[in-house]
Amino acid sequence: MVLLVPFDGSDLSRTALERATEFATYRNEDVLALTVIPNEPEYALERGWVDANDPFDIEAIADRMAEQVEAVAPEASFRYEVPEDVSSMASITTDVVRTVRQVANEVDASIVFVGSENAGRVSTPVSSVGSPVSEDPQYDVHIVRHA
């Protein structure tokens, strides 16, 4: 079994990775940090993965995320995925959530550690990944709300 951490480099995702690493010692499980990188330059720009004048390079973004994961949790594994564009009607957030859920299922995640200020609240911003990921009954969810 695996502890899965969707990781975007934010303070909350870093804290979620730290918590998963601490928890892994108690459960004797591996930690997998997952970065989902949509093939959308604006998404990368909004998250601070690239600057406005930088070329959009998925491999370079993945390398930077892997370095950040290594700095926070050297014992964690890192993986990145580029979500499939299944439907032109789906939002980028929907694609990211679907990818996180697919990977969680694939690696048989026992717990997903999500860094989210608003997961589980009554109203959820459209761009929130935390709430939809937390709705899947196949795994437990640890929500980190404070970095």
Where would I find each of the regions flagged by the language model?
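Structural beta-alpha unit
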Residues: A73-V112, A119-G120, Y139
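Active-site phosphate/pyrophosphate- and oxyanion-stabilizing loops and adjacent acidic/basic residues
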Residues: E67, R101, S131
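Short, well-ordered secondary-structure micro-motifs
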Residues: A16, Y43-R47, M89-T94, T124-P125
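Acidic, proline/glycine-rich short linear motifs
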Residues: I37-R64, V86
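Gly/Ser-rich helix-loop-strand patches that form or flank binding pockets
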Residues: S110-A147
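Small/aliphatic-rich secondary-structure junction motif
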Residues: V2-R47
